[in-house]
């Protein structure tokens, strides 16, 4: 499995972020491939990663580590979340007015049924 979740821009912004945006390789290897959980009931789907900036949250349930394309839950405004696809490389490279998107280093894989944010 090849991972291209690092670019020169991401490395530079990581200095602002104060930590690596990208999760450890062992963690990435445990995330199901895109479409792998289509038949899994929503309550049983596992969020493997959590990213945030201000009130915005992104939860990763499936990932293509070669392209950075992820499937998951994104809530950019409170109460306005939806399931869909987003690109982790694009999120990692965002830097607007000193704000960046951060990876929640304390987040453990969690089923939807246990994520109060998604209920």
Where are these regions (language model features)?
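Short non-domain terminal segments
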Residues: 19, 49-50, 59, 84, ...
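Proteins with a high burden of low-complexity, intrinsically disordered sequence enriched in S/T/G/P/A and R
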Residues: 23-26, 56-62, 88
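Hydrophobic/aromatic-rich, well-ordered segments within soluble, folded domains that form packed cores
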Residues: 48-66
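Acidic, aromatic-enriched beta-alpha/helix-loop junctions
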Residues: 61-95
């Amino acid at each position: 499995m090849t991972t291209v979740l690092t670019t020169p821009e991401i490395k530079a912004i990581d200095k602002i972020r104060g930590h690596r945006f990208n999760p450890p390789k062992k963690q990435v290897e445990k995330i199901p491939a895109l479409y792998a959980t289509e038949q899994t009931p929503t309550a049983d789907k596992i969020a493997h990663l959590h990213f945030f900036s201000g009130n915005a949250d992104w939860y990763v349930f499936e990932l293509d580590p070669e392209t950075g394309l992820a499937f998951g839950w994104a809530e950019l405004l409170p109460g306005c979340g939806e399931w869909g696809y987003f690109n982790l490389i694009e999120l990692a490279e965002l830097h607007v007015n000193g704000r960046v998107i951060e990876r929640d280093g304390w987040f453990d894989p969690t089923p939807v049924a246990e994520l109060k944010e998604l209920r």
